[in-house]
């Protein structure tokens, strides 16, 4: 799973539309291709979700204001966990329950997709197994280490299975073997991006 996240800087002092006199965004007139998701239907849902939840990231509630740059107006990157709908649902449920506050990816995935690594402060919209937006999270820390150096604390933070390091290694080895880019093979010293995050919406 690649986290190609579009950062959105929170500004508690950002004026609302009434104060600024700016025209509010109308989702019906916005180009879905500007939203960082793969299909127009999901793009429309993501826009609506972002409009309703961006206040939880410290931003004004209105989703987009005419006149801003594209980088300031598009929602954060929207993505789902795992490589199949059932896994996406299970891991999303763990986030919504407060059990999952971390995720990990192979560094090679970012190289293969020519995608930037996540950084602290970036926002993401989490999709369920049917590509509907369900949660807004903010990355709090990112560390690149090797598979065999991931520790018990991080394994527990991933909130999967019995939350032990042993089960983390078994599950993620199987996942990486299924999903590594062509030409890459699993090894205990392969580089892994370990990302921690906080749930902004819905609030626990």
Language model segments and positions:
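Mixed-charge, low-complexity intrinsically disordered regions
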Residues: 2-136, 145-204
């Amino acid at each position: 799973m690649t986290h190609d996240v579009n950062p959105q800087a929170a500004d508690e002092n950002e004026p609302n539309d009434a104060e600024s006199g700016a025209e509010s965004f109308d989702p019906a007139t916005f180009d879905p291709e500007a939203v960082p998701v793969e299909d127009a239907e999901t793009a429309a849902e993501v826009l609506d979700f972002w409009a309703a939840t961006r206040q939880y990231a410290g931003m004004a509630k209105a989703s987009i204001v005419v006149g801003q740059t594209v980088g300031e107006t598009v929602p954060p990157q929207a993505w789902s966990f795992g490589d199949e709908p059932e896994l996406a649902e299970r891991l999303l449920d763990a986030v919504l329950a407060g059990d999952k506050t971390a995720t990990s990816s192979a560094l090679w995935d970012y190289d293969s997709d020519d995608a930037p690594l996540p950084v602290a402060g970036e926002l993401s919209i989490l999709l369920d197994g049917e590509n509907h937006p369900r949660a807004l999270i903010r990355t709090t820390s990112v560390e690149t280490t090797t598979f065999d150096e991931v520790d018990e604390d991080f394994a527990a933070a991933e909130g999967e299975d019995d939350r032990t390091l042993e089960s983390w290694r078994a599950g993620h080895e199987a996942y990486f073997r299924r999903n590594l880019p062509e030409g890459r093979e699993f090894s205990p010293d392969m580089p892994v991006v370990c990302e921690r995050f906080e749930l902004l919406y819905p609030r626990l």
